[in-house]
Amino acid sequence: MSPWVTAEELHAAASRVTGLDDFGPDDYGDGLAELIASYERDADLTPRGEKVARAMLRGALAARLCSEAGWRAYPEHAQVRLARPLFVTGLPRTGTTALHRLLAADPAHQGLELWLAEAPQPRPPRDTWADNPVFRYIQAGCERHHVEHPEFMGVHYMAADQVEECWQLLRQSMRSVSWECLAHLPSYSAWLRTQDWTGAYRRHRRNLQLIGLGTERIDCRSSCQHSSTWSAAM
């Protein structure tokens, strides 16, 4: 029986979406292999589930491509100082999203909007977003999701310009609890518990520097994951 997906297929799909081909150092290949194997072995996915899982994996790789391109184009990102960041963390479904979005509404703070998490780049002026093709592509996907799953809007509202959790940046390293929150992946979970998170958070930090280039506001981030990987996050 042929595999449900291969790493090569996912890389090719991410390159087609972005027009980019430099994925950076291979510090994520082991995690990608573990995820592909665990989805196949453990998750018992339906055809629709396989489609969703492929899209999430492709999205993580596409975001990785955008980050690598951004770091090359804006080497000055490395000089951005992340001063006194705020981290919101806690158990899922306990109000952390509401608190995070409330804090991010302060003009002195900056959150991580969904479209910039999925396609990291220096944050453009907000009045240009509606004309940005990447923003429009991601917003169109959100609107389709609202139509197909209207009940989800009351659980966790999503829009391209809405502040989101920063675990999406950790997905670039294929080390994130988000995968196991959305599918039954016990073998991946067991592997994840043995991992050093330092490299994943180093990449996370570089992404925040890239996105925050040209601003001096306090970063406000949220993820239930930070409570279990706190030492690496610091």
Q: Language-model features: where?
A:
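PAPS-dependent sulfation machinery
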Residues: 118-222
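Phosphate-binding P-loop
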Residues: 76-83
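Long, basic/Gly/Ser/Thr-rich N-terminal segments
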Residues: 1-73
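Post-Walker A helix-loop "phosphate-sensing" segment adjacent to the P-loop in P-loop NTPases
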Residues: 105-115
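Glycine-rich phosphate-binding P-loop
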Residues: 87-107
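Short, hydrophobic/aromatic alpha-helical segments in well-folded domains
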Residues: 87, 98, 207-210, 233-234
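Aromatic-acidic/polar surface patches that form glycan- and anion
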Residues: 3, 46, 50, 92, ...
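Long, well-ordered mid-to-C-terminal structural blocks that present hydrophobic/aromatic surfaces
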Residues: 218-234
